[in-house]
From Swiss-Prot:
Recorded family membership: Belongs to the OXA1/ALB3/YidC family. Type 1 subfamily.
Keyword Ubl conjugation assigned: no
Pfam families: 60KD_IMP (PF02096), YidC_periplas (PF14849)
Assembly notes: Interacts with the Sec translocase complex via SecD. Specifically interacts with transmembrane segments of nascent integral membrane proteins during membrane integration.
Swiss-Prot/TrEMBL GO biological process terms: protein insertion into membrane; protein transport
Protein name: Membrane protein insertase YidC
One term of GO molecular function: membrane insertase activity
Record InterPro entries: Membr_insert_YidC (IPR019998), Membr_insert_YidC_N (IPR028053), YidC/ALB3/OXA1/COX18 (IPR001708), YidC/Oxa/ALB_C (IPR028055), YidC_ALB_C (IPR047196), YidC_periplasmic_sf (IPR038221)
Topology of this chain in the membrane: Multi-pass membrane protein
Function: Required for the insertion and/or proper folding and/or complex formation of integral membrane proteins into the membrane. Involved in integration of membrane proteins that insert both dependently and independently of the Sec translocase complex, as well as at least some lipoproteins. Aids folding of multispanning membrane proteins.
Subcellular location: Cell inner membrane
Length: 548
């Protein structure tokens, strides 16, 4: 087996992966064209979980250096969230909107107090209408945090204070509750946190461009418990009313999309119930409800939860809750992608440019794999040396395939040649390539990350297709340098067009991945020359010109 035939193996694996990606993408809810009503049936369904829907209240805004939140005083839900450090598109001055409440699309972070005496319990009437001393809160330059207290007093005189605390540069929102019991009997309350979202994206929010070369990232719900580090929960599963219902200590519930995460993290020592719910009208929810606590007459008790609403920055999320960093969707090759990203981030801390960091990590990966690459070329050289003997054996045995196979294996054994030796390094390289593919497409640090010259976003395709063409040229050069024993006309034609086929595929790949492949090909050319020189000394290679 020679190096050009190996390209056929790569192509087969590559195309199979692209087809699988397209199939996975087709299984998810598709962007919707029609207007979706979101305000009629949510209340009743949510009430089944002890979580009523929001009503009309006053909207207050909270702005820090990185977040701008809109909170409805009816229930104290966060109805909008703007990420000020992340533009909507590369050239846009408009910030990315993560949470949103419109007739077409709803994505909210709800929270409050349920339980027997909780003001958010539907049995106790409408959701609490909190009072607040002003409608706009802005983090001053001299402040490190900002506190927004919302207060509600029920008919019995019990005072419930819901406090949002945001820190400078942070995406973790502390949501605290103070329950002051003014009655003559104990109050039984539970905290809840719920994320609800329209399952089908409107076209205005669709981030998937479609096609075989589009990276599909998971959009849906997820949770973590004391027994399960991380598990995804598809929106389709919730729409089919196959709902989650699990009790656990610790953990979190979340909704994910490419680059961004919203998650509720209960802050208590008791047991929490994690659930999902189909709220009707195409809206799904995931949330938690804590076990009840008793607040004695004349006493004040404090409860706590944390909301992460922002970019999926792994180290910062891991500091908020164990395993929350796993919400960065690196797919089934996460165990390779995560170490690669940590290495890439370490290199970036010195270079300050993600593109050059990718180049360095390419040299590191190819350097580590050099022994396998050398073994691959050595195996292929030995296979070429055996071709005259194999051809003579085939002519001698004619159509007796069984004897051909037996004698061929005996020949390999006698000559100490592994017929699969040329394939194994390729099989090892493919997962690394795909892991980089996932890493570059799911790491928010690479979103809109510039390189040099015309490459302003390493996570997006080359707008002028220059990098894919360079990649195709390096692939063509490697092909021309590689000796071949392929005589089948069809295989020869396929291999001739292989650089063109790969160039077309790479037109829509992230620029960072194309940079990796170009540098990898250049390293291959250098390594190829070094290996061939060593093989020449052993009489396993000669620098004869390839026949065109």
């Amino acid at each position: 087996m020679d190096s050009q035939r190996n390209l056929l193996i790569i192509a087969l694996l590559f195309v199979s992966f692209m087809i699988w990606q397209a199939w996975e993408q087709d299984k998810n809810p598709q962007p919707q064209q029609q207007t979706t009503q979101t305000t009629t049936t949510a209340a009743g369904s949510a009430a089944d979980q002890g979580v009523p829907a929001s009503g009309q209240g006053k909207l207050i805004t909270v702005k820090t250096d990185v977040l701008e939140l809109t909170i409805n005083t009816n229930g104290g839900d966060i109805e909008q969230a703007l990420l000020l450090a992340y533009p909507k598109t590369l050239k846009s001055t408009e910030p990315f909107q993560l949470l949103e409440t419109t007739p077409q699309f709803v994505y909210q972070a709800q929270s409050g107090l349920t339980g027997r005496d909780g003001p958010d319990n539907p049995a106790n009437g409408p959701r609490p209408l909190y009072s607040v001393d002003k409608e706009a809160f802005v983090l001053a330059d001299s402040q490190d945090e900002i506190v927004i207290p919302l207060t509600y007093t029920d008919k019995a005189g019990n005072v419930f204070t819901k406090t949002f605390t945001l820190k400078r540069g942070g995406y973790a929102v502390n949501v605290g509750y103070s329950v002051q019991n003014a009655s003559e009997k104990p109050l039984e309350v539970s905290t809840f946190g719920q994320l609800k979202q329209t399952a089908a994206l409107p076209t205005s929010r669709d981030t998937q461009t479609g096609g075989l070369s589009t990276m599909h990232t998971f959009r849906g719900a997820a949770f973590s418990t004391s027994d399960t580090k991380y598990e995804k929960y598809k929106f389709d599963t919730i729409l089919d009313n196959e709902n989650l219902n699990v009790s656990t200590k610790n953990g979190w519930v979340a909704m994910l999309q490419q680059y961004f995460t919203t998650a509720w993290v209960p802050q208590n020592n008791g047991t929490n119930n994690f659930y999902t719910a189909n709220l009707g009208n195409g809206i799904v929810a995931i949330g938690y409800k804590s076990q009840p606590v008793l607040v004695q007459p004349g006493q004040t008790d404090k409860l706590q939860s944390v909301l992460w609403v922002g970019p999926a920055i792994q180290d910062k999320m891991a500091a908020v809750a164990p395993h929350l960093d796993l919400t960065v969707d690196y797919g089934w090759l996460w165990f390779i992608s995560q170490p690669l990203f940590k290495l890439l981030k370490f290199i970036h801390s010195f270079l300050g440019n993600w593109g050059f960091s990718i180049i360095v990590i390419t040299f590191i990966v190819r350097g580590i794999m050099y022994p396998l690459t050398k073994a691959q070329y050595t195996s292929m050289a030995k296979m070429r040396m055996l071709q005259p003997k194999i051809q003579a054996m085939r002519e001698r045995l004619g159509d007796d395939k069984q004897r051909q196979s037996q004698e061929m294996m005996a020949l390999y054994k006698a000559e100490k040649v592994n017929p699969l030796g040329g394939c194994f390094p390729l099989i090892i390289q493919m997962p690394i390539f795909l892991a980089l593919y996932y890493m570059l497409s799911a790491s928010v640090e690479l979103r809109h990350a510039p390189f040099i010259l015309w490459i302003h976003d390493l996570s997006a395709q080359d707008p002028y297709y220059i990098l894919p063409i360079i990649m195709g040229a390096t692939m063509f050069f490697i092909q021309k340098m590689s000796p071949t024993t392929v005589t089948d006309p069809m295989q020869q034609k396929i291999m001739t067009f292989m650089p063109v086929i790969f160039t077309v595929f790479f037109l829509w790949f992230p620029s960072g991945l194309v940079v990796y492949y170009i540098v990898s090909n250049l390293v291959t050319i250098i390594q190829q020359q070094l290996i061939y020189r060593g093989l020449e000394k052993r009489g396993l290679h000669s620098r004869e010109k390839k026949k065109s």
